[in-house]
From Swiss-Prot:
Residues 76-111 are annotated as: Coil 1A. GO terms for cellular component: intermediate filament; nuclear envelope; nuclear lamina. GO terms for molecular function: structural constituent of cytoskeleton. Residues 425-452 are annotated as: Tail. This is Retrograde protein of 51 kDa. Residues 279-424 are annotated as: Coil 2. The keyword Coiled coil applies. Residues 33-50 have a biased composition (Low complexity). Residues 1-13 have a biased composition (Basic and acidic residues). Residues 1-50 are annotated as: Disordered. Signal peptide: none annotated. Residues 122-259 are annotated as: Coil 1B.
């Protein structure tokens, strides 16, 4: 290859010729004289100008001269820099031309070597590369099949995740509805408790009223018993007084029978007198006693009648109130029993709803845990598959690059061996072949090592 490059370089000759640049600079003294002459001429011209105008023109001329001088210096510096860079470039190109001429001469003097071992080596490497490519293609097919299966599994897992999420949403809605229903039941239970408390307060008030009525009835009965005893005592007293009066009558009758014969006083009847006086006294006593007994009897009868009437009216009223209170108590007891039964039923319902809510929460937690596990497993599988796919694609790209470099190298060697190359661009092909040889051999070596 080097000999071919030398032969190609012989057909080309360097057309770059060395160039010489001469920079002439005037002497400062001559420049000063020229400036002096220009100044003298300008002085002769300006001598006819007034002093103020001359001063203005001289200051503007000095400013223009300084500006032109600075501009010329910058231009000269730029030209010097460009010249120095151009000279360096010319020296570099001359050295490169000499180097290329030396390489061309070395390639001309080099003998043609046998390229058959190189061809065999590259064909062997190419066969190995093709074998590796076929193996990787088969493994790629297996990996693609496995990837398709995993993608199907991922799709099924996604559908399962969607199903679990929908079920979780349904469970959440059901839990929310049960929570709302439970709140309604708790509110109703609280209202029932308040109603039961108010009914218990009313029942306590009615009990107090009933106790007061019963106490009043007991007092009235005690008063009735007292009045009855007093009436009986008065009856007994009246009976006693009546018997006493009868006794006194009998006694008087007996006294009349047993009295001695009255002394007859002439002109005066003492028996009739005492009899009439005694009868008069007895009548007065009987009248006074009867009046007193009648008054006592009337008073007792009136008092007893009024008390009896009061007791009767009070008993009727108390009986009606007592009956009404008993009916109200029975009604309240029935309502309390109904509320207690409803409270027990609501407590049972709340307990069952809480148990159902706990069960649904547990099922939801299990489903969420399974969903998280499935997600983690899915993410791990996807990460593993992506890493595996990335490595397979990298190996495939590596092998494709190696294959392309080997094909280019083989094409170059075929052209060299078959003698179809032209002199124009031969050195470029040789350099490309040398570069791709090293790159292709290194890539093929890495691919074989990684596949093995």
């Amino acid at each position: 290859m080097q000999k071919g490059a030398k032969i190609e370089d012989e057909g080309r000759q360097s057309r770059i010729q060395s160039r010489n640049f001469i920079i002439q600079r005037s002497d400062p003294r001559t420049r000063g004289s020229s400036v002096y002459s220009s100044r003298s001429s300008s002085y002769n011209v300006r001598s006819s100008i007034s002093p103020g105008v001359y001063q203005q023109l001289s200051s503007s001329g000095i400013t223009d001269f300084k500006g032109n001088r600075e501009k010329e210096k910058r231009e000269m510096q730029n030209l010097n820099e460009r010249l120095a860079s151009y000279i360096e470039k010319v020296h570099f190109l001359d050295a490169q031309v000499k180097k290329l001429e030396a390489e061309n001469e070395a390639l001309r003097n080099r003998k043609v070597e046998d390229l058959q071992p190189i061809r065999d080596a590259y064909e062997n490497e190419l066969r190995q590369a093709r074998k590796v490519i076929d193996e990787l293609a088969s493994s790629k097919g297996v990996a693609e099949g496995k990837l398709a299966g995993l993608q199907d599994e991922i799709g099924s897992l996604r559908e399962l995740i969607v199903t679990y999420e929908s079920q979780a949403k349904d469970y959440r809605k059901k839990i929310d509805s049960l929570g709302n229903q439970l709140g309604e039941f708790e509110g109703e239970l609280q209202s029932l408790r308040l109603r039961v408390g108010s009914l218990e307060d009313e029942n306590a008030k009615l009990r107090e009223l009933l106790e007061k009525v019963q106490e009043q009835n007991r007092r009235l009965r005690a008063d009735l018993d007292t009045e009855t005893a007093a009436h009986i005592e008065a009856d007994c007293l009246a009976q006693t007084k009546t018997e006493e009066a009868e006794f006194y009558r009998d006694l008087l009758d007996q006294l009349e029978l047993l009295k001695p014969e009255p002394i007859q006083i002439k002109g005066m009847d003492y028996a009739d007198f005492w009899k009439s006086e005694l009868a008069k006294c007895v009548r007065e006593i009987n009248l006074a006693y009867d009046e007193k007994i009648d008054l006592i009897q009337q008073d007792c009868e009136a008092k007893y009648a009024s008390q009896i009437n009061q007791l009767r009216s009070g008993n009727v009223k108390d009986g009606m109130q007592l009956q009404h209170s008993q009916e109200e108590v029975k009604k309240l007891r029935g309502q309390l029993q109904d509320k207690n039964a409803a409270y027990a039923e609501l407590a049972t319902r709340i307990a069952s709803l809480q148990a159902e809510r706990d069960e649904l929460a547990r099922q939801l937690a299990d489903i969420e845990r399974e969903l998280e596990e499935q997600k983690l497993k899915y993410n791990r599988d996807v990460g593993d598959l992506e890493s595996e796919l990335t490595s397979v694609l990298a190996q495939l790209q590596h092998l494709m690059d190696a294959k392309m470099s080997l094909e280019l190298e083989i094409a170059c060697y075929k052209k060299l061996l078959e003698g179809e190359e032209s002199r124009v661009g031969l050195r470029t092909l040789v350099e490309q072949a040398i570069g791709t040889q090293s790159k292709g051999s290194a890539s093929l070596k890495d691919a074989i090592q990684s596949s093995s």
